[in-house]
Design a protein with these regions (language model features):
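Juxtamembrane transmembrane-helix boundary motif
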Residues: 1-18, 23-35, 39, 56-140, ...
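Short N-terminal amphipathic alpha-helix/helix-capping patch enriched in small hydrophobics
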Residues: 24-28, 44, 51
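Small-residue hotspots at the loop-to-helix junctions and early N-terminal turns
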Residues: 39-44, 168, 172
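Transmembrane alpha-helices of multi-pass small-molecule transport proteins
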Residues: 45-60
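Short hydrophobic/aromatic, small-residue-rich stretches within specific transmembrane helices
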Residues: 46-50, 171-175, 197-201
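Hydrophobic alpha-helical transmembrane segments of multi-pass integral membrane proteins
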Residues: 166-183
Length: 242
């Protein structure tokens, strides 16, 4: 019964994140931290759930011709090698919780401070900037189990490289690819997902299916962003201080 309730929480997280083009890796980690999952299971479980959720979102965005692959490729190609390197690195439990807690707090701050720029024109994306950001986000993705979209999205918007809707469409395949590579590195390093991942994955997929459609058609992003920011901030504090 507890596993089913926990799966429903994963599904709810996936739904909320999918409304803004994200998979939910940061909140998956937050939930597992609250439930005191072993640290060697948290990262691979979060990455696997990212893959499930982002696969559907990527398919839906691509089917609607919303993914700007030319803009995505420099970010993606730079991120994959560093995501693999990050996945190879296994931190001890205290250091992992410290790093992940800081990542969650940073993600919460980004979500809270992010502003929509629908009416402003996009700027050209410089190759050096795209590769630098892609490499940095990829490394953090592989190291912590965060797909990277929660950092990529606000950067794209803040730098005027993409509109919010374009950013959502770019984030899903970025998260998918980096999560696949990061999971490969984590499993090579001896980490494996929790035994109940299949149940959590079904819930995450259902949430992604609903959330992506809701986000594309109806829901304002503002309230979802602040709610998720509060969850991530609380989880980051819990990891760092308790």
């Amino acid at each position: 019964m507890a596993d089913i309730m926990f799966a429903l929480l994963f599904g709810a997280v996936s739904l909320l994140y999918a409304t803004v083009g994200q998979a939910g890796g940061t909140a998956f980690l937050a939930l597992m931290a609250f439930a005191s999952f072993p640290s060697n299971e948290m990262r691979p479980t979060a990455l696997l759930l990212n893959i499930v959720a982002a696969s559907y979102s990527t398919w839906l965005f691509n089917r609607g011709s919303l993914v700007d692959w030319a803009k995505l490729m420099p970010l993606l190609l730079a991120s994959l090698p560093t995501a693999l390197v990050g996945g190879f690195i296994v931190l001890d439990e205290r250091l992992y919780k410290t790093v992940t807690g800081l990542v969650l707090l940073l993600a919460a701050a980004i979500l809270a401070l992010r502003r929509a720029r629908d009416g402003e024109p996009d700027r050209p994306t410089p190759l050096w900037g795209a590769t630098s950001i892609g490499a940095a986000v990829g490394f953090v993705s592989g190291l912590t189990g965060v797909g990277g979209g929660v950092f990529l999205a606000p950067l794209l918007i803040a730098l005027h490289w993409a509109s919010p809707k374009q950013t959502a469409a770019l984030s899903a395949p970025f998260i998918l690819a980096n999560s696949v590579v990061g999971l490969a590195g984590a499993m090579y390093a001896g980490q494996t997902p929790t035994a109940d991942t299949w149940l959590f994955a079904l819930a995450a997929l259902a949430g992604a299916m609903i959330g992506t459609i809701v986000g594309l058609r109806w829901l304002s992003q503002t309230m979802t962003r602040y709610m998720l920011g509060a969850i991530l901030g609380a989880a980051g504090i819990q990891l760092l201080f308790f």
